[in-house]
Amino acid sequence: KSAFGQELQEVVHKIYNFRNPDGWKYQIRNAIALNFDTEYHKTLGTNKSNNLDGNFKSKLRLGTIFNEATIGFLGRIGFKELQPIHNSIAFNTHLNNGNTPFVRGVESFLYYETSLAYVAYDATIQGSLFNNNSPITFKPNTIRFNAEIGYKFTAKKWVFGYAYHFHSNKLNNLRNNRGNDYGQLFFSYLFR
């Protein structure tokens, strides 16, 4: 209720002339949320012209919302020389200015990313860690697979990209057991 999800969904349904959403009485109840996330990335290798690389990615999330560990791979094929991972839009680390030794270089690359996650707890499905007063909760799938393929480009302060995403189901026995897939198109501008 505190996130105003019901109100937002009702506005969207009204704009697109969809039927009124139902079922909000069954939503997961409000709870205190505190999570700690940490990530580790390592370049596994690059070619001589530095326009092709492979990177190991890992992430650990602990807290009252998510408890999960993820490992994955990100490969990039650059149309020009790739930026290192500590200065690349692939890792959202291109926020540099004149006070850093790094420059905001032009990047243009295709990428493929896969990950496998072990999920110990997901409050968005299971409800709060501290109380069990949500009317409907489920046990999540403990293993989740994600894949993404796309293109990213940046020049000066502009970032553009598009991607195709696939996520395996978070639950078993859904009407659609084939996972979720969708496209993404994004633009951004860095003010600093």
Predicted regions and their residues:
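Transmembrane beta-strand segments of outer-membrane beta-barrel domains in Gram-negative
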Residues: 1-66
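Membrane-embedded beta-strands of outer-membrane beta-barrel proteins
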Residues: 34-38, 71-73, 149, 185-187
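Residue-level signature of outer-membrane beta-barrel architecture
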Residues: 38-44, 60-62, 75-77, 153-155, ...
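A general structural signal for well-ordered alpha-helical packing
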Residues: 55-57, 70-74, 107-113
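Conserved mixed alpha/beta catalytic, RNA-binding, or beta-rich assembly cores of soluble enzyme
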Residues: 64-88
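Outer membrane beta-barrel transmembrane domains
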Residues: 80-192
